[in-house]
Curated annotation (Swiss-Prot):
InterPro entries: AAA+_ATPase (IPR003593), DNA_recomb/repair_RecA (IPR013765), DNA_recomb/repair_RecA_CS (IPR020584), P-loop_NTPase (IPR027417), RecA-like_C (IPR049261), RecA-like_N (IPR049428), RecA_ATP-bd (IPR020588), RecA_C_sf (IPR023400). ATP binds at G66, P67, E68, S69, S70, G71, K72, T73. One of its GO terms (cellular component) is cytoplasm. It comes from Neisseria meningitidis serogroup B (strain ATCC BAA-335 / MC58). It is found in: Cytoplasm. It comes from the Bacteria. This is Protein RecA. Its main location: cytoplasm. The gene is recA. PANTHER family: MITOCHONDRIAL DNA REPAIR PROTEIN RECA HOMOLOG-RELATED, RECA.
Amino acid sequence: MSDDKSKALAAALAQIEKSFGKGAIMKMDGSQQEENLEVISTGSLGLDLALGVGGLPRGRIVEIFGPESSGKTTLCLEAVAQCQKNGGVCAFVDAEHAFDPVYARKLGVKVEELYLSQPDTGEQALEICDTLVRSGGIDMVVVDSVAALVPKAEIEGDMGDSHVGLQARLMSQALRKLTGHIKKTNTLVVFINQIRMKIGVMFGSPETTTGGNALKFYSSVRLDIRRTGSIKKGEEVLGNETRVKVIKNKVAPPFRQAEFDILYGEGISWEGELIDIGVKNDIINKSGAWYSYNGAKIGQGKDNVRVWLKENPEVANEIDAKIRALNGVEMHITEGTQDETDGERPEE
């Protein structure tokens, strides 16, 4: 570059920094880049691996969508529990007015430390979310759900009034404001969304999500969660078999998927995932019905091994760390937010 061009560029950069602050523009030479993307674990080892970076990326928008009773809120509460365990501060914007503190506590959420808002309108919910994000004091915000973000005009209007595109415009405007603040404050914002059917679709999937297209574009990660079956013991149903597909991923390759069990009253079966993924990665050895680790037998049958791992959390954490290291997705947590319980699952 010639001297004249260099001087002109230096003057322009100085003017930008003077007007908008230091760091408003920078060279991508590596010195200013984050060495590792900070993430918050989903509470599911398989999903952390499928995401390619070890969890949900901070400073980004994530959308989790699926049919009713598929595990959307459970997955979010598991992530909240993981964030709190590492010293994070979380907020839950409950637009559906259906938050269950008893269930959340069973999943390991410290309910007394969780900030809960139950707004009256969609505008109020998104304004609360924006204010929390801009404060810089929140690590994770969950909005449950986009479908329940009802515009004020619709609430104040009469039943049967037409309000075409109001919610989509509301979401589009809010996300334009939120995106920059989310990146600057390194906050994770998770939107839970529902599925609707498009009428008259002959080819392709008739399914779509609520709130227009803005959330699809602004989301760095989109997760499609589905219930694939039931977990039974005799005639008693103990939980759901769940599959999550990574539909969109801006931080790693997309279209991967994870399968795990959600047990009623317990949440995601982390120990069950350790067994399945551990066997797949040759960290746990399986011979017939017997499972062994480091040459020592740890149980006969998956259920017995699951119980054994619950009783021996230090071994479970060791297996988890080995699986993450083998797959190259070790979590990078903000310095200074970890506490002495890091790596341990919340006890029931």
